[in-house]
């Protein structure tokens, strides 16, 4: 696990999951008042660099931003969000292709295709096509390992669920929300943003601790190795926070994004609810830790011990293999970028970058 600590707010908006690539780019489009700048170009053609320059310029002006990292290469950006301006600039190419719904009104296309010398690139047509195919094959293989690991982790979650006192969990969640979430006036407008705080990457699992510390001063950490208890707790807290009028940031589980929340932020209260487990341990001082074993029949749970240990060992090995394949895919992508970089007019890219900075800032 790589723990990224910075003063900035960092998220992912997409990741490889057991169901394949799962992205939250479209939900961002539908956040109230959001205007999108959609970058179009090839690999290695300056999309991430353009966004890094915009992020740097915004930070120098003291603007609050969210940096959206690429799960296939966390050192690269997939986007920059300006929460207060209700603007975002995104890499709108595969695997998270986006097209404008209302060009010029809701979205502005920032095309860099004109900076590519197609004549130079066509000289290496076969090499480029082969690298695209190899990259796709490696990513597909990695996804299958992640799917296998996800199946085992889901089995562990179901085993824990067999031993859980869910009525006790519900009572606890109700008391917790009553204590921490005062009901807002009826004029309050609840809302939800979807982000990923962690993902499986070529560097292994990455978890943005710095984001937690940037968005919150109070931390409620649910220590749950298998996820059945924390899953229900976060579902109940999410529903109650929205019912009480809060704007929240919901962070789905990168392994089971369709039906499990791992973390939840309430920025107006500087409050975070976090899940701590072997895949993304939470190492932050001053947390209020809740051991989810308190909600389990431990004697019943002991009967699953061998099964749970096997699942964890096997899932770890499968994810290690997925990470290795993702690293190979990144190397393949890096090689692909060399062909494109040799065919790009970066002076023209810089010109577009300056125009975009002036338009957004």
Spans of model-derived segments:
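N-terminal accessory targeting/assembly segments
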Residues: 2-61, 220
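A cross-family "folded-core" feature that marks the main globular domain of proteins
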Residues: 39-40, 50, 58, 66-69, ...
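Glycine-rich phosphate-binding P-loop
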Residues: 36-55, 204-241
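N-terminal low-complexity, Ser/Thr/acidic repeat segments characteristic of secreted
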Residues: 35, 185-190, 218, 351-358
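Conserved nucleotide-sensing/catalytic segment adjacent to the nucleotide-binding pocket
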Residues: 2-21, 56-120, 126-127, 241-320
């Amino acid at each position: 696990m790589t723990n990224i600590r910075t003063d900035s707010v960092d998220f992912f908006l997409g990741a490889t999951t057991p169901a394949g690539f799962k992205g939250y780019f479209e939900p961002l489009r539908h956040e109230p008042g959001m205007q999108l700048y959609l970058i179009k170009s090839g690999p290695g053609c300056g999309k991430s660099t353009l966004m890094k320059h915009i992020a740097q310029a915004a930070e120098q002006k003291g603007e609050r931003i969210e940096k959206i990292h690429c799960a296939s290469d966390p050192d690269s950006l997939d986007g920059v969000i300006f929460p207060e301006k209700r603007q975002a600039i995104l890499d709108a190419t595969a695997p998270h292709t986006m097209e404008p719904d209302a060009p010029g009104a809701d979205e502005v296309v920032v095309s860099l295709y004109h900076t590519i010398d197609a004549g130079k690139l066509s000289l290496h047509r076969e090499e480029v096509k082969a690298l695209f195919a190899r990259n796709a094959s490696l990513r597909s293989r990695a996804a299958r390992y992640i799917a296998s690991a996800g199946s085992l982790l889901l089995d562990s979650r179901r085993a824990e669920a067999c031993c859980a006192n869910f009525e006790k969990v519900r009572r606890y969640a109700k008391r917790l929300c009553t204590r921490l979430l005062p009901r807002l006036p009826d004029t309050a407008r609840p809302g939800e943003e979807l982000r990923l705080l962690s993902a499986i990457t070529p560097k292994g699992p990455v978890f943005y601790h710095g984001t937690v510390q940037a968005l919150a001063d109070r931390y409620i950490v649910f220590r749950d190795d298998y996820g059945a208890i924390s899953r229900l707790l976060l579902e109940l807290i999410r529903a109650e926070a929205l019912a009480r009028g809060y704007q929240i940031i919901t962070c789905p589980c990168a392994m089971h994004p369709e039906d499990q929340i791992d973390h939840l932020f309430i920025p107006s209260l500087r409050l975070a609810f976090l899940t701590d487990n072997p895949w993304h341990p939470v190492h932050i001082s001053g947390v209020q830790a809740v051991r989810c074993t308190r909600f389990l029949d431990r004697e019943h749970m002991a009967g699953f011990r061998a099964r749970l240990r096997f699942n964890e060992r096997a899932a770890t090995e499968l994810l290690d293999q997925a990470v290795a394949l993702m690293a190979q895919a990144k190397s393949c992508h890096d090689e692909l970028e060399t062909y494109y970089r040799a065919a790009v007019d970066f002076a023209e890219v810089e010109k577009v970058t300056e125009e975009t900075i002036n338009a957004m800032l």
